[in-house]
Amino acid sequence: MPRKAREFIDRPEALYHIVCRGNNKKRIFRRSEDYRRLLNIIRLSKKEFPFYFYSYNFLPNHFHLLVETREFSLSKFMGRVNFLYATYFNHRHNRSGHVFQDRFFSNIIDKEKYFWAVGCYIDLNAVRAGLVQNPKDYFWSSFSIYCQKIYGGDLIDRDKFLSYIGINDLEQARLDYIKFVEGKLCSEDAKTPVFIKSTKMI
């Protein structure tokens, strides 16, 4: 049965928290090459759909993204990413059918109030899932880039993300963000953050 069409509002220069889940909560990543393939698809898609890419976290059965649009269609971008990855995943693992549950979910985030809060929430996903005790130890997350454990290259717009703290010293901002995230490890906000309660799912 075809999926029902859903309403979606594209807003230029908006900050989106995006979530894509595996169909029936099944795994969408089985091997390291699967994670790398999705990252590469996103990297290549930035050339066609210019946007700011701030955070990601890839869990076994879903993934999170934090992006800021720049005069482009978010729905077209996500449609391309999910189509290319689903095509790869089905071929690579000799399967057919839907890879993702629905298409994607997104929240428009208030940049003035919750910019770092949503980044922190995304970076702590692997901790909440019980995969690691500290987010810096999870390889498939942008937090490892902010901690300089891996090289992000042209994938993450790190400096623009860090500039939102409002200080000119980006290295100090990076250290402040790491401290901010690690300070939320035992916080209730990390489980059900205020931005989730205050923004609209579309």
Locate the predicted segments by residue.
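Short Pro-Cys-Gly-centered "Cys-loop" motif that presents a nucleophilic cysteine in a tight turn
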Residues: 1-55, 59, 68-202
